[in-house]
């Protein structure tokens, strides 16, 4: 089989502040569009109003409500309140700089600190594009918070491998593949079976014994992917972002009633209304307070996941992209603005003979890295 050709980044969804989303004009892009500098980009981090791109040469470029550029960058993490930048130092240390988003890369940063990596060689040896490791710091003993204090230490025994932040909660994946969550829980996004908040990282007991490979935090929902390719999802389902039946889409005529089993027993909040073909009430799930197993169409195995504010994107082992949830700005990539409460494959990449390798969601948009499929 021939080697894969160099890939490129694509974007779709909300771009009302002029952030780079390919060739689209106006406030939104409904279908994947190549980014102008997509070949050189290796990391993408998107907030609501701007996006940070890091190139393979270490150049950081901002697009949208925040603008500017800087060199010697290893990683960047964008949020509405601040921009965190990891810059290469003269030795093994890296320099972490935190800027207010409105004055990013201009003047002095709000805060800066030297960071010593825990181990060398943590980046992908093949140089494959990734969404980046921030907000977890290279030392794996602390992370960056969008609210002061910006530097948040982690207990050493957590042995963090990945950390993701939602609007009010945090998810941590440790070296053993176990998941911890903490923060606000009013939408069930912590996965502990209640709507209570947690001040400290708490092991997700429902997944204990299962080895997870990746976690993703949406605005108020959570996803994790196991090493065997299974997807577990929980939290708020207001726009169908959990791929479970939701009242909002049913009222818009954009969903169909489906049979659900043991919905009450698994702890989810179920609301029922009339309308099923057999006359029985149709089940709708508003909040799923602990992990539910989600099957993709055709039994596809997942390898990567990312969440927007109210939408979800998953990459399969065969390089296909599935999206669902809120689609008002085209962030699902299906050439329309329909919201979905079930996974749907993004046909653009199939039609173009592209294999998706990475996905990273902003609150209202989506960025995808894909390569041309190798030819036998």
Swiss-Prot record:
RCC1 repeats lie at residues 6-56, 176-227, 229-317, 318-371. The modification (3R)-3-hydroxyarginine is found at residue 141. Its main location: nucleus. PROSITE patterns: RCC1_2, RCC1_3. The keyword Repeat applies. Keywords: Chromatin regulator, Chromosome, Hydroxylation, Repeat. It comes from the Eukaryota. GO terms for cellular component: chromosome; cytosol; plasma membrane. GO terms for biological process: chromatin organization. InterPro entries: RCC1/BLIP-II, RCC1_domain-containing, Reg_chr_condens. Residues 1-169 are annotated as: Interaction with KDM8. It is found in: Chromosome. Found in a complex with KDM8. Interacts (via N-terminus) with KDM8 (via N-terminus). Plays a role in transcriptional repression of satellite repeats, possibly by regulating H3K36 methylation levels in centromeric regions together with KDM8. Possibly together with KDM8, is involved in proper mitotic spindle organization and chromosome segregation. Plays a role in regulating alpha-tubulin deacetylation and cytoskeletal microtubule stability, thereby promoting cell migration and TGF-beta-induced epithelial to mesenchymal transition (EMT), potentially through the inhibition of KDM8. This is RCC1 domain-containing protein 1. It comes from Homo sapiens. The lineage of its organism: Eukaryota, Metazoa, Chordata, Craniata, Vertebrata. The gene is RCCD1.
